[in-house]
């Protein structure tokens, strides 16, 4: 079986992560004590991807939970599914990172990292054929960003040939938790560009907008936002957990979505999103799902795909539907909006179909797009970074933990390079005489 090892770090990561486990447990019919109470054999067929079966027939998530302070962990433990996790897999410090990337990456986090790696190793040895890791974290704080990226680079050293997928919550443009977010995020992106294979980019403001505009929630809580994220996370991995007509795994996903190794930051979307009140008045159809999932308002990060072009995209449909109809709709989208797709990668939209829909829906779809417009997000963070860094504001918090200004400069230029790479491919045309003539073949159609 192709197992995935789930790691969640920091306050944000632990909250998203525990919500994700609620959704996955529900889909596989596993109750909060780890017992199977489902009704369909399909739920158990590939349950090993995310669960370990213990001797007494209980299912234990392949999850590692880490934080530099005990608070969030305690609330996960007392939460609805808190008892399902292996108690040894909670790894936490006492000091906290205080929203300081350097503390998470170099001082406090570095002291705790070995105990986390021990747990990761133990879980990895429990797998038949480990497919890869998925990490939930935010980039604005200290633990998820600093210690999260430290862990990713350590895992990269130890398991170089396994996929590394991250669900990274970026700081949002208008909603800010802490003033040093741009520093933490830039230092993290610097790491993610080098060490992660696929990053699903999320941000609170876009999620907030979806809750407010589409779901008609007047005062969305973090719980509501995390519910959206967990629906997407469940959708990304449903092909691995259930049988389907067109299957896909983390590596296939990467092969189809990443034309150039550094450009692995994806926008994600989910459909159908309807307000709770109007759900029963709508029949879902494949065209409707397709239309909604390509809608810019549906993207879970604050970048507008209409401002850039799609290098590649992937659509995962769930439920009983005809693959023929799915393919027709996908071709239809590409033909109608051809200007939004780069013409030098033909057939750049991949679709997969999984037979089992999420709880309470007859069909659903998850969208993952590699769009050049994501540079808007990096640009925004980079501008805020430069504004503060020019004055060396708040820098003493980082240098005090032993960091060097040089590292900031490097991270800044790496992020700016990333932005200009996206821009370069946005402007590129198929017939242009350029250095990347032979790179058109980089995306194989399976």
From Swiss-Prot:
Cellular component GO terms, alphabetical: cytoplasm; microtubule
GO MF entries: GTP binding; GTPase activity; metal ion binding; structural constituent of cytoskeleton
Cofactor or coenzyme needed: Mg(2+)
Pfam families, per the entry: Tubulin, Tubulin_C
One of the protein's GO biological processes: microtubule-based process
SMART domains linked to this entry: Tubulin, Tubulin_C
UniProt KW Metal-binding keyword: yes
Biased composition (Polar residues): 417-426
Residue numbers spanned by region Disordered: 417-446
UniProt superkingdom: Eukaryota
Residues the record lists as binding GTP: 11, 69, 138, 142-144, 204, 226
UniProt-annotated binding residues for Mg(2+): 69
Keywords: Cytoplasm, Cytoskeleton, GTP-binding, Magnesium, Metal-binding, Microtubule, Nucleotide-binding
Biased composition (Acidic residues): 429-446
The protein's role, per its UniProt record: Tubulin is the major constituent of microtubules, a cylinder consisting of laterally associated linear protofilaments composed of alpha- and beta-tubulin heterodimers. Microtubules grow by the addition of GTP-tubulin dimers to the microtubule end, where a stabilizing cap forms. Below the cap, tubulin dimers are in GDP-bound state, owing to GTPase activity of alpha-tubulin.
Stated family: Belongs to the tubulin family.
Protein name: Tubulin beta-4 chain
Protein species of origin: Eleusine indica (Goosegrass)
The encoding gene: TUBB4
């Amino acid at each position: 079986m192709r197992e995935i090892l789930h790691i969640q770090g920091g306050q944000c990561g632990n909250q998203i992560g525990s919500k994700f486990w609620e959704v996955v447990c529900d889909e596989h019919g596993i109750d909060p004590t780890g017992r199977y109470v489902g009704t369909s054999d399909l739920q158990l067929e590939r349950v090993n991807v995310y669960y370990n079966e213990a001797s007494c027939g209980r299912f234990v998530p392949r999850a590692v939970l880490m934080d530099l302070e005990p608070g969030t962990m305690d609330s996960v433990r007392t939460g609805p599914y808190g008892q399902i996790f292996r108690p040894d897999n909670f790894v936490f410090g006492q000091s906290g990172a205080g929203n300081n990337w350097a503390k998470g990456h170099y001082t406090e986090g570095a002291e705790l990292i070995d105990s986390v790696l021990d747990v990761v190793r133990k879980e990895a040895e429990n797998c038949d054929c480990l497919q890869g890791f998925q990490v939930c974290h935010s980039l604005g704080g200290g633990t998820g960003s600093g210690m999260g990226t430290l862990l990713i680079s350590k895992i990269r050293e130890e398991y170089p040939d396994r996929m590394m997928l991250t669900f990274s919550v970026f700081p949002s443009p208008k909603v800010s938790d802490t003033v040093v977010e741009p520093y933490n995020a830039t230092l993290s992106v610097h790491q993610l560009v080098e060490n992660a294979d696929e990053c699903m980019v999320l941000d609170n403001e876009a999620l907030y907008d979806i809750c407010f505009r589409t779901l008609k929630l007047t005062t969305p809580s973090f719980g509501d936002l995390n519910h959206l994220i967990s629906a997407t996370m469940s959708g990304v991995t449903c092909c691995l957990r259930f049988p389907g007509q067109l299957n896909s795994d983390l590596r296939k996903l990467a092969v189809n979505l990443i034309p150039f190794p550094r450009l692995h930051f994806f926008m994600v979307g989910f459909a159908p999103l309807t307000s709770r009140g109007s759900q029963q008045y709508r029949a879902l159809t494949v065209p409707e799902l397709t239309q909604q999932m390509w809608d810019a308002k549906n993207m879970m990060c604050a970048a507008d795909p209409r401002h850039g072009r799609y290098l590649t995209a992937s659509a995962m449909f769930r439920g009983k539907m005809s693959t023929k109809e799915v393919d027709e709709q996908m071709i239809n989208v590409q033909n109608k909006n051809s200007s939004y797709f780069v013409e030098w990668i033909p057939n750049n939209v991949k679709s997969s179909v999984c037979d089992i829909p999420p709880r309470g829906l007859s069909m659903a779809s998850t969208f993952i797009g590699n769009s050049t417009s994501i540079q808007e997000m990096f640009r925004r963070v980079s501008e805020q970074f430069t504004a503060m860094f020019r004055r060396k504001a708040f820098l003493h918090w980082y240098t005090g933990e032993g960091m060097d200004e040089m590292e900031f400069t490097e991270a800044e230029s790496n992020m700016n390079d990333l932005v200009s790479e996206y821009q370069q491919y946005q402007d590129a045309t198929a017939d242009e005489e350029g250095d990347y003539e032979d790179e058109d073949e980089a995306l194989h159609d399976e």
